Amino acid sequence: MQILRGCIALFVWGAFTFSTEIILAQPEPQVISSRFRESVSLDVNNTVLKKMGSVRDYLSEQQWEDAVKILIQISDEYGDSLYPEAPGRYLRVSEYCQNLLAGFPPEAIAIYREKVDPRAKRWYEEALAGSGRQPLVNITEQALMSSYGDDALNLLGEMAWEEGQLAEARSLWRKLIPRTASDSPVYDTGLFHYPDTDLPVPEILARLILVSFFQGNFSQADFEQGQFRKKYSQATGRLAGKEGNLSDLLAEILADPSRVSLTDNRSELKTFAGHQTRNFKAAQPPEIGAVDWSFPVPLVWSQEFTAKPAFGFRVPPGLFPVVHQEHVFFNDAERIYGLNWKTGLPAWSQDPQSSPILYPSASHRVSRLPFRPVVGVPRYTSTIAGGRLYARMGSPVTSVAKDERLGLFSDLVCLDLDQGQGKLLWKISSAQLREQNFVWSFEGAPVVSGNRLYVVLHRGFPEVQTNVACFSADTGEMIWNQKVCLALRSIEEGVNYISHLLLTLGEDQLYLSTDMGAIASLNTVNGKLNWLVTYPSQDKTDKEELSNHMKTGLVPCLYDRGILFAAPQDSSQLMAFDAESGLLLWQRPWPEQIRNLLGATQSTLVVSGDRLFGLNRATGRITWKTGYHDPEGFGYGRGILAGDFIYWPLREEILVVHTEQGYLKQKISLRKQYGATGGNLVIAGNQLLIASPRRLTAFGTDGQIPANDSKKISALSIK
C-alpha cells in the first residue's frame, strides 16, 4: 500500500489543487509500508502479466503499433480481471490499460485512436440521440483514450452534477485536467489524466471549485478560487447557466453559502450506522427525559455466548434497531420485532397483548444449538428502503465447522412495511446457494439501491471466500455474484465461526472491508471490481479474543464526500482512501481496537473503542480524545452524532461530547438513576432509544435526566 502519489491532488495544477481539503492540512509523518506477504488470493491472470511485459518491451523499442495491438487485446480478453498497478493496489485490467495509454507518446495514441474511434463515435452518437448514460459508460470503460473519451467524461460529469452526485462529478471532471510540466517526470499509472482534451480547461476547473463549494467545503472552495483568479483572471466561459468572466461568476456564487443544502443531517436511521454510507448525523439532539417504556428482548441461542466477554456479560449489545415513520424494528437470529417508538406498543396495534413479532409465523421451529463450538460475536442488522425491511436471519455462523452435524443456514427476508404491515414478500435461504456441496452464508444485512439489493456472501470451505452478490429487491432473484478474494482459514476446521460483514454504498459504488487483508470497491451495475487494496493482516486465532465484543467491532467502511475511511478488524491501522481510485490519502497506527467509525463531519472523523476520538478527517491527526482509564468505563455499544454533539454510551452512563472541540457537555447516569445499561443508541423523532443486550429502552421528553457536572469528572481524559 502506498501514500497517494502527488499529494492527493485529485488534480494538482501548479499550486492549485482540486482535492477535498487534503492539501491544506499538514499531515503527520507517515511510514510507507514495504512489500508484505498478502493474506488473500486474487484473480490476477499470469497471462496478463506476461503480455504487459511485452507491451513495455515494444514501448522501449518504439514499436507503437505492436504495443497498442497487444494492449487492446489484453483489455478485450482480460478486462475484468485485476492487475497489480502498485504493491498492494490492484485495478481492473481495462482501467489500467487506459491509464497506461494516457502516458503513451502522441504517435502511439494516434494509432490507438485509429483502431477504436469508429466504435467510440457510434456510442457517442447513440448518447446524443437520447440513448441515455450507458453508451457514454461504454466509452469510459472500453475506449476512454479514444477521441471521444473527454466528451464522454464531460457529459457524465454533467449528469452526475444534475443528480447531486458531487463526488462522482468531481472524479469524472478531474480526469479531464491534463498533466503539466510541474508533475513528476515519471508517468504515474495510478490516476488517469486525459492528455489532450479540446474542452476549455478553465471552465472545468471552475466546475471543480463549485463541487467543493456545494459539498460544504467552503474554505477549500475559497482557497481554490484564489488560486484560480491568479492563474485565469481573464478566462471566460459558461458556469451555472451564465456566460461571463469565470472568476467573477465564481465569486458571485461563493459569496452566498445559503445556496448550499448539506445532506449531513438525516431524518431516520434506516440501517446499521443510520445510513448506507455508514455516516449519519441526526439534525437535532434528542430530548432525554424519564424512561417512557422498555421492551425485554427474549434470548436466543446465538446470544447465549459460550465465551465470556468482559465484566461477566455473556451477551453483547448486538441489536441494531432501525426506524421507519412511527415504528422501530429490530431482529435477532430468529425473529423480527416491530414496536411503536412513541408508545412501546406492537406495531400497527393499540392492543398491548398483540404480538410484536412480525417474522416468522408462530409455527416457526426454534433453531437448535450447533454441535461444534462457536467462535465470534453475534450481531443482528436490517435495512429499510422503499417501504420495505430487509433482514439477515438464521444462524449467525458464516464459516461452518467441517464436521458440524447441523445445517447452519442463513436467510434474507423482505417484509412489506408500507402496504402489508410487515407481511413477508420473499425469502432466500443460503441453502439455495449450494455450490459443489459447499454452502454459502449471508453476512450482514444488505444495502439497497433502487430495485436492487447487495449483500456479502461467505463460505469457509474449501478455502475462505468472500463474494458480493446482487439480488432483485422485488423478487429476491440473483442478478450477479462477484468473487472478491480467497484466504486461508485461520480458525481450526472443527470450530464454527461468526462474522457479520456489511457493505457501504456511496454514490452508486459499493465498498467492502473484508477483515482479512483486503478492501475493495465494486460497480453496482455489474459487480465488476473497480479497485482492491491489500494491507498486512494480523492473523487473529485467539478464540476468547475473537469472541469478546470488547475486542472486536462491527466496522464497515465509512463513505463521506469522496473519501473512504476504513478500520479493518484484522489490522491496527486506520486508513483513508480516495474512494474513486483507491489511492491512499493517509493511514495511522491506532493505540487500541477501533470498534466503531461513528461518523464524519465537515472537518472531523469520530471513532470509538475503549475511548472516544476526534480526528482531522483530512490528515488523520487526533484533535481530541475523551474517556475513562478504568476498563469498567470503556465504551459499550454504538454511539450516535446528533446536532453538534456525540452521544457515546458506556456501560453505566452516556457521555455527551462536542463533535468538533471534544469537550464534555453532559454526563447522563443510566445505572444509578434507572438501573439501565448502555448499548446501541437510536434516535427516533426527538426520543433516544437504547438497545442493550436484553432490553430496548425508550426515553421520553418529560422529566429531564439529571446531568452530572462535567468539571467533577476527574477520571476523564479530555484533550
Predicted regions and their residues:
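Repeat-blade elements of multi-bladed beta-propeller folds
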Residues: E203-A206, R266-L269, G312-R335, S361-L412, ...
